[in-house]
Amino acid sequence: MAESSTVERYRFRKMIERLENLRGQGTELITIYIPPENRLSDVIAQMREEYSQASNIKSKRTRKNVQSAIEVVMQRLKMVGETPENGLVVLVGTVQDGTKEKMVAELIEPPEPVDRFIYRCDSKFYLEPLKEYLEEKDVYGILVMDRREATIGLVKGKRIEPVKRLTSDVPGKHKAGGQSQRRFDRLIEHAAHEFYQKVGEAAREAFEDVKDLKGIIVGGPGPTKEEFLDGDYLPKDLKEKVLTVVDVGNTDESGLREALNKAEEALKEAELVREKRLVRKFMEEAVNGELAAYGEEVDELLKMGAVEVLLVSEDLEGYKVILRCPECGYENIVTVKEKDEAKKYVEECPECGEAELNVEEIKDIVDYYVELAEQMGSNVEIISTETEEGAQFYNAFRGLGALLRFRPK
């Protein structure tokens, strides 16, 4: 089963946090961002030049480490062969590991295309472009309008794609009075009605086939946007996706950006609302129903395939230690806060008594639960602690819970 977006983001964030803590003694950590259109053979050729130039580094130690890192880069790129679809991020260098040094080599295929070639040599890895991938990349629609024009666009992350611009034939104000004024007012309203219909149709064409459209922002100066939404111009399913209505001064492409800036809080809240609903559903079921579980019970229910959705707090920390008897195969899985606590559980096998249990594996606790859930066909949601519900879930349920498909008897 494919990982949920919350799990992907969690793992990506954890990887970046780990890489952020790595340091070299000198400027000897190499970072390379390779766009998909760049050939790896060209990058290897550039690395040969960098290797030659590195011979000018005065510090013997730094020179040795930089050249060693460049050699590793060239070896790894030769093994990859062709540039992946989204490009490649290469992080190589000698880092401090307590009192020792070790060579680190990470090749990362990013979730989105690398947009420019970057080569850096520093005392830390250059991770800013990677951090940008952690920003929300959900797709939203934007419509800004008044009676003169309307502009429609799509938001993907922080990138705005203008889709369509429409201009109207709605006349301006008229100074005639009496019968002429009333007749002219009717013409204006009729023209506005026709323009709203065109805008509604254009919005339908722009938004209805967008996969996973999270919501729509509507903006503009004055009351036109409200008149449009109050009428039957936007299809019902799209009208239900309108997250917020904002006042903006422009209705051209600059108005799209203005509307997005004003709607940022609403967009953030939309994702948090989804999370809040999920946690509330779990809490209600935990108190009043049978289809929720938490604590040690979750492990067994996961293995039985009874879990529909596994909820894991992003603040959950610790490790799962898998111990096994080399003689009879008896297995014991325990939870520890620190890795070095594992040795406390190395004891005589309680099943056969013929040998000591071996520490077979130590896994990050979140990775353990995510992998187990995926093996059993359960969905996984990583719950933030930014909301009151998320914080309560972590504190009251220790950051681990499950919504069940069924309750075993």
Curated annotation (Swiss-Prot):
**GO MF terms, alphabetically ordered:** translation release factor activity, codon specific
Q: Where in the cell is it found?
A: Cytoplasm
Q: Does the keyword Lyase apply?
A: no
Q: Which UniProt keywords apply?
A: Cytoplasm, Protein biosynthesis
Q: Which Pfam families match?
A: eRF1_1, eRF1_2, eRF1_3
Which domain of life, per UniProt? Answer: Archaea
State the GO CC annotations.
cytoplasm
InterPro entries registered for this protein in UniProt: eFR1_2_sf, eRF1_1_Pelota, eRF1_1_sf, eRF1_2, eRF1_3, Peptide_chain-rel_aRF1, Peptide_chain-rel_eRF1/aRF1, Ribosomal_eL30-like_sf
Q: What is its main location?
A: cytoplasm
Instruction: State what this protein does.
Output: Directs the termination of nascent peptide synthesis (translation) in response to the termination codons UAA, UAG and UGA.
Output the NCBIfam families linked to this UniProt entry. aRF1_eRF1
Q: Which family does it belong to?
A: Belongs to the eukaryotic release factor 1 family.
Q: State how it assembles.
A: Heterodimer of two subunits, one of which binds GTP.
What protein name does the entry list? Peptide chain release factor subunit 1
Organism field? Methanopyrus kandleri (strain AV19 / DSM 6324 / JCM 9639 / NBRC 100938)
Q: What is the lineage of its organism?
A: Archaea, Methanobacteriati, Methanobacteriota, Methanomada group, Methanopyri
